[in-house]
């Protein structure tokens, strides 16, 4: 996967017979949960098709062998459904969603139920930080999630800027441990959120938001392959593609930024 592919690859279209969105019901559920628990939801509407396609680039431009994919923060399943459409027999998809209402919607999703034969699917209704504590459940022997599972691709929909810097670092470190050597990670952030957070939530939360953004920029400097701005999304967003060299590395030492770094990331 190259920077050029991520930045300039034309938006692919979802097949006409299966849209990433399941209609107004998903949007209403998403909005209701956003109003109830915005910190964990992080948006008022699911991602649009253009952003979904940017996030699944490592799967649509993939090696010719079975792959294992982890999706974290699936919401109502717009990315999950796209993954289910493009995965092939022998592939495995492990979906992690902490919101019980979203998890229940995913369990009943007809697109996921109609995935290709031979595509393993597992749903974990927990936070990704607690994934190792989840009890094993009987089911399809092709289901992913065995102890020590490492993934070729992780697609993260978590709203990092709603979390503390310590939480974000812990999650990113976990992603590095969960990725196979050379595995790829995608995530996204909305544009213009730093100024908006300062104006709407005050200077203290604005400072926390900026620190999380700086942490993400360090992570991208260490592992980033490219980024892509998606204007056809509400709100506009930027998708990031990263690759793990394998294993944990101290990519973001715990220290204060220099004045030059502070200006560069504000």
Predicted features by range, described:
Residues 169-181:
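A short glycine-rich, Lys/Arg-flanked "PGG" loop and its adjoining helix->strand segment in the class I
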Residues 206-266:
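Class I S-adenosyl-L-methionine
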Residues 181-191:
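Conserved beta-strand signature within the Rossmann-like core of class I S-adenosyl-L-methionine
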Residues 66-75:
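Conserved class I S-adenosyl-L-methionine
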Residues 105-143:
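S-adenosyl-L-methionine
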Residues 77-81:
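Glycine-rich SAM-binding Motif I of class I
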Residues 24-63:
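Class I SAM-dependent methyltransferase Rossmann-like catalytic core
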Residues 99:
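Conserved SAM/SAH-binding beta-strand->alpha-helix loop
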């Amino acid at each position: 996967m190259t920077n050029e592919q991520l930045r300039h690859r034309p938006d692919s279209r979802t097949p006409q017979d299966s849209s990433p969105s399941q209609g107004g019901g998903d949007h209403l559920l998403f909005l209701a949960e956003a109003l109830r628990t915005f910190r964990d939801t992080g948006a008022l509407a699911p991602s649009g098709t253009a952003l979904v396609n940017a996030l699944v680039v490592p799967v649509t431009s993939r090696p010719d062998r079975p792959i294992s994919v982890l999706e974290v923060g699936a919401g109502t399943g717009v990315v999950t459904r796209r993954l289910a459409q493009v995965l092939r027999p022998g592939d495995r998809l492990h979906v992690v969603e902490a919101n019980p209402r979203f998890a229940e919607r995913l369990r009943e999703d007809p697109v996921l139920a109609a995935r290709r034969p031979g595509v393993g699917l597992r749903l974990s209704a927990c936070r990704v930080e607690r994934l190792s504590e989840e009890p094993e459940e009987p089911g399809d022997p092709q289901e992913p999630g065995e102890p020590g599972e490492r993934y070729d691709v992780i697609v993260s929909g978590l709203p990092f800027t709603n979390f503390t810097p310590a939480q974000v670092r812990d999650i990113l470190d976990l992603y590095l441990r969960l990725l196979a050597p050379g595995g790829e990670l995608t995530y996204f952030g909305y544009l213009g959120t730093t100024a908006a957070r300062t104006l709407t939530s005050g200077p203290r939360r604005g400072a926390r938001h900026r620190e999380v953004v700086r942490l993400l920029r360090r992570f991208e400097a260490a592992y980033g392959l490219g980024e892509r701005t998606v204007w056809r999304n509400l709100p506009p967003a930027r998708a990031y593609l990263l690759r793990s060299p394998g294993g944990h590395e101290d990519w973001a030492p715990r220290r204060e930024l220099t004045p030059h770094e502070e200006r560069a990331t504000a």
